[in-house]
Swiss-Prot record:
Protein name in UniProt: ATP-dependent Clp protease ATP-binding subunit ClpX
Gene name of this polypeptide: clpX
GO biological process, any: proteolysis involved in protein catabolic process
Subunit structure: Component of the ClpX-ClpP complex. Forms a hexameric ring that, in the presence of ATP, binds to fourteen ClpP subunits assembled into a disk-like structure with a central cavity, resembling the structure of eukaryotic proteasomes.
Disulfide-bonded cysteines: none
Amino acid sequence: MTDTRNGEDNGKLLYCSFCGKSQHEVRKLIAGPSVFICDECVDLCNDIIREEVQEAQAESSAHKLPAPKEISAILDQYVIGQERAKKVLSVAVYNHYKRLNQRDKKDDVELGKSNILLIGPTGSGKTLLAETLARLLNVPFTIADATTLTEAGYVGEDVENIIQKLLQKCDYDVEKAQMGIVYIDEIDKISRKSDNPSITRDVSGEGVQQALLKLIEGTVASVPPQGGRKHPQQEFLQVDTRNILFICGGAFAGLEKVIQARSTKGGIGFGAEVRSKQEGKKIGESLREVEPDDLVKFGLIPEFVGRLPVIATLEELDEAALVQILTEPKNALTKQYAKLFEMEGVDLEFRSDALKSVAQRALERKTGARGLRSILEGILLDTMYEIPSQQDVSKVVIDESVIDGSSKPLLIYENSEPQAKAAPDA
């Protein structure tokens, strides 16, 4: 019997039965009944099987569309609050992909595409909602910044580059890209503004809206396979955008005033209704009453508004919501930093007063949840710098005094008393 481990057969030179390489050309030759296979062919077989399994899983997941309640439940694991926005998004996304699953079947009814507009303050979770949806549905996803986009002929980024980015996310698989999701952020920044002093781009923003309009409503975009205009001889890829779900998001600062002006009853004289400036609703409550005409008055062109029929508004995050964001989601920041410290063999504890203080600081900065990471990074920077070089530290405790800068984190050593130093005077 041959030695199956070393590929030696009584001194004879052995060859792989699949690729024909000799035992000296490969690292390992494995013997079976009258056949041999080398390590390279084993790796190749594993790659083939892995690809086929992944394709089968992707195909099955495409047909297994989660119900709106299931989509919302998964969003709950990552996004705190914003219940109405989750419900609107869940139904819209469910209907969109249900429509795609039915598109090959002959039917008298043609289902239209419902793109989505997310309106909410900075750091309220617009981008996170879109990212989580794409991850849940296992479809290509890309983010574009509307402020960098220009119409053709101006200095800046062409709208077709959005589709290029989407293709890059799925290795230029056109079929996959045509099932993807595109999130366009800062969409409110391309509203028409006659006082825009810029001379290097479309000064009104209307040109960018017109260019995006064609992409969003459905067109066949020609995209070079490997970037830009450097190789004009390359054959362009044709991507049909009719089935790509576009989600546009923006803070729309000042939109609540447009809504309030519309909803406030007019009148003069003794019969007029008197309203103080302080009397009114929170911004989130006002945004919930938004209508297409309000968006047109804000500066979006009517055709563009018409292509975004599903509108979801997000509430401002209060202190309690920010504390929840710090601790509850699967990817909560406190859990992430605790994991980093755990890799050093150290426990990290945030006291409740510290979490409230971090939330208050984020509210003061008006950055919402987006500012939480930078606050924690600044607080933990020195500790993360020192801990890998220190021995016997078993726990780090963060309390309110650390957040306000009056003391350093409390370090607890193995078999010793906790130590904390006062922060140096500013």
